[in-house]
Amino acid sequence: MLVWLAEHLVKYYSGFNVFSYLTFRAIVSLLTALFISLWMGPRMIARLQKLAFGQVVRNDGPESHFSKRGTPTMGGIMILTAITVSVLLWAYPSNPYVWCVLTVLIGYGIIGFVDDYRKVVRKDTKGLIARWKYFWMSVIALGVAFALYLAGKDTPATELVVPFFKDVMPQLGLFYILLAYFVIVGTGNAVNLTDGLDGLAIMPTVFVAAGFALVAWATGNMNFANYLHIPYLRHAGELVIVCTAIVGAGLGFLWFNTYPAQVFMGDVGSLALGGALGIIAVLLRQEFLLVIMGGVFVVETLSVILQVGSFKLRGQRIFRMAPIHHHYELKGWPEPRVIVRFWIISLMLVLIGLATLKVR
């Protein structure tokens, strides 16, 4: 919005030209989202407390979590608000990639909101019925994936980028839709599963978004894309604005979500952020990179799959409790230790993922 306005005002004052610089807009996008989150935080927490929208804690969970019962949840609303406002202010409104991310972000946010609302009002830890949750997540993911396929069919936008290989970029064809679907839905659920401790999900999300900001900048720059042997995608540059908005909103939320948390993001935040990371990876053609950089989310999800599979097939559990962060809690690790160590691992994985762009 402000970019569009600046384009019309630059003929009156050349200083408005600064709004056309991607680096400037990336910085102010981060700061805008950060300040909105920090401003909304106390007001959102007070409002949620007044409405008695408190966290519902499972009775079979770690005993240390019982003290979290009643902590305000659905704080993801402030994250989504901060991201959306910042992106609308600082990104080019004509960029289709921006609208793809906002569609998934807001769509998954609405699904998460309904899920959270059922939990806090009905005091039901199950929330929205699983099949309906997956149905609506699938509708959004398939809709966006199909639209992207039609727009980018037989172009670099539908190729598969394989790490460590320069010239291995097979054209996916219709398999692009299937891959995009699994990445978007899978990442949404993976971040949702990770969001079980104070600050555990938001910081890896910030790290991955920051990593994708760098990738988006390189992908939208023809010289750097050619240098790194990745597809040049002319719309990708504006995803830098989206990624920095996620970073800013996430850091602002962490101010209130750090241990001991004053507010939880709820499904409205975790599903939306996961879906956003998924669609960003799809748009940048970096699904494999997401697996590396988002390794914490992958391991959390695999721990649940292995736990359920082992119990059904052998009648035995692999972990004391899944997702795996609860396993370490039950082993006696203090919650802050689990959180910070997972953060460290996440940061290392993002750096390793970025390094793979050069190792080809």
From Swiss-Prot:
UniProt-listed InterPro entries: Glycosyl_transferase_4 (IPR000715), PNAcMuramoyl-5peptid_Trfase (IPR003524), PNAcMuramoyl-5peptid_Trfase_CS (IPR018480)
Annotated protein name in UniProt: Phospho-N-acetylmuramoyl-pentapeptide-transferase
Signal peptide (residue range): none
Broad EC category: transferase
Main function: Catalyzes the initial step of the lipid cycle reactions in the biosynthesis of the cell wall peptidoglycan: transfers peptidoglycan precursor phospho-MurNAc-pentapeptide from UDP-MurNAc-pentapeptide onto the lipid carrier undecaprenyl phosphate, yielding undecaprenyl-pyrophosphoryl-MurNAc-pentapeptide, known as lipid I.
Pathway assigned in UniProt: Cell wall biogenesis; peptidoglycan biosynthesis
Any single Pfam family the record assigns to this protein: Glycos_transf_4
